[in-house]
From Swiss-Prot:
Family: Belongs to the mitochondrion-specific ribosomal protein mL61 family.
Entry GO CC: mitochondrial inner membrane; mitochondrial large ribosomal subunit; mitochondrion
Gene Ontology molecular function: structural constituent of ribosome
Entry function: Component of the mitochondrial ribosome (mitoribosome), a dedicated translation machinery responsible for the synthesis of mitochondrial genome-encoded proteins, including at least some of the essential transmembrane subunits of the mitochondrial respiratory chain. The mitoribosomes are attached to the mitochondrial inner membrane and translation products are cotranslationally integrated into the membrane. mL61 is not essential in cells grown at 30 degrees Celsius but is required for mitochondrial translation in cells grown at 18 degrees Celsius.
Name recorded for this polypeptide: Large ribosomal subunit protein mL61
Pfam families: L51_S25_CI-B8 (PF05047)
Subcellular location: Mitochondrion
Record flagged with keyword Ribonucleoprotein: yes
Alphabetized PANTHER family for the sequence: MITOCHONDRIAL RIBOSOMAL PROTEIN S25, SMALL RIBOSOMAL SUBUNIT PROTEIN MS25
SMART domains in alphabetical order: L51_S25_CI-B8 (SM00916)
Subunit comment: Component of the mitochondrial large ribosomal subunit (mt-LSU). Mature yeast 74S mitochondrial ribosomes consist of a small (37S) and a large (54S) subunit. The 37S small subunit contains a 15S ribosomal RNA (15S mt-rRNA) and 34 different proteins. The 54S large subunit contains a 21S rRNA (21S mt-rRNA) and 46 different proteins.
Gene encoding the protein: MRP49
One GO BP: mitochondrial translation
Swiss-Prot/TrEMBL keywords: Mitochondrion, Ribonucleoprotein, Ribosomal protein
Length: 137
């Protein structure tokens, strides 16, 4: 696969093929999201890491006016507890809602976010696709 084809595939993963986070969040109501989790998978942090890797780029792509903070904590001690949470922030900087991401799959974290945040699903005609359309599917 050529470099251009790889880039198109990557861009479409962010904009077109990752469906669940294709939402529009009201930037007047929320200022952003803050994710806090550890760099390693132990103690139930794998779902948070996959959410960050797979879903956060799409959320950022379609909500460019929102701020997304990711706090990754280095923790080598499996006995030490590290927060694993997603916080929805107001414009005053206060936390509106908190989602505990520990021991959850990334899809469940995204569904919890959709339940707690006011949003509108992105209309099909507003989904951005790049390159030949047959290569996206």
């Amino acid at each position: 696969m050529s470099k251009v084809a790889q880039q198109l595939k990557f861009l479409n993963k962010i904009s077109a093929t990752t469906r669940l986070p294709q939402i529009l969040v009201d930037p007047k109501k929320y200022s952003g999201l803050r994710l806090t989790f550890q760099t390693k998978n132990h103690n139930g942090h794998m779902g948070a890491r996959v959410f960050w890797h797979n879903y956060l780029p799409t959320l950022q792509f379609y909500n460019p006016r929102m701020k997304f903070d990711v706090i990754r904590i280095k923790n080598e001690d499996k006995q030490k507890s590290v927060p694993c949470k997603l916080e929805i922030l107001s414009h005053e900087g206060s936390v509106v809602e908190t989602i505990d991401m520990r021991n959850k799959m990334h899809e469940d974290i995204m569904k919890d976010l959709l339940d707690k945040i006011e949003h509108v699903p992105l209309p099909e005609n507003e989904i951005i696709r790049v390159g030949p359309q047959e290569s996206i599917i």
